[in-house]
């Protein structure tokens, strides 16, 4: 049996506490962390190709009101509906554009909010 196979057999017989201690000792001995995924080491070689999937994995989005357009009243109504703000707060947000209307929401919620604002005549950006 090879050394690697022997090590695997030993690891199979270890408890969770022993495995935790092994991980910590391994990190201290070799100056590495177990949290770093292998794919990160390959990222610099992939260059821009690896950057594109990272952007697609984004889970939180901001809806930014860039310009309220000509129909501010309709935009204020939509902002109130989306945020639950009072009339004055919603008006201040619309008048102070560009400002975030919703922050850290899912892609579906961000797209739905952006669509409502666009229907009201606003210029919107989802980041």
Swiss-Prot record:
Signal peptide: none
GO biological process: translation
One Pfam assignment: Ribosomal_L12_N
A GO cellular component annotation in the UniProt record: cytosolic large ribosomal subunit
GO terms for MF: mRNA binding; structural constituent of ribosome
UniProt KW keywords: Ribonucleoprotein, Ribosomal protein
InterPro entries (alphabetical): Ribosomal_bL12, Ribosomal_bL12_C, Ribosomal_bL12_C/ClpS-like, Ribosomal_bL12_oligo, Ribosomal_bL12_oligo_N_sf
Family per similarity comment: Belongs to the bacterial ribosomal protein bL12 family.
Subunit structure, as described in the record: Homodimer. Part of the ribosomal stalk of the 50S ribosomal subunit. Forms a multimeric L10(L12)X complex, where L10 forms an elongated spine to which 2 to 4 L12 dimers bind in a sequential fashion. Binds GTP-bound translation factors.
Function: Forms part of the ribosomal stalk which helps the ribosome interact with GTP-bound translation factors. Is thus essential for accurate translation.
Protein name: Large ribosomal subunit protein bL12
Gene from which this protein is expressed: rplL
């Amino acid at each position: 049996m090879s050394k690697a196979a022997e090590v695997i057999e030993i690891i199979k017989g270890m408890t969770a506490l022993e495995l935790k201690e092994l991980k910590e000792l391994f990190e201290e001995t070799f100056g590495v962390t177990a949290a770093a995924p292998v794919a990160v080491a390959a990222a610099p070689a992939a260059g821009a190709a690896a950057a594109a999937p990272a952007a697609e994995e984004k889970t939180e989005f901001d809806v930014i009101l860039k310009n309220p357009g000509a129909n501010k009243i309709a935009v204020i109504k939509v902002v109130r509906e989306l945020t639950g703000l009072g009339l004055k707060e919603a008006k201040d947000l619309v008048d102070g554009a560009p400002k975030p209307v919703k922050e850290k929401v899912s892609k579906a919620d961000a797209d739905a909010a952006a669509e409502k604002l666009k229907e009201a005549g606003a210029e919107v950006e989802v980041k």
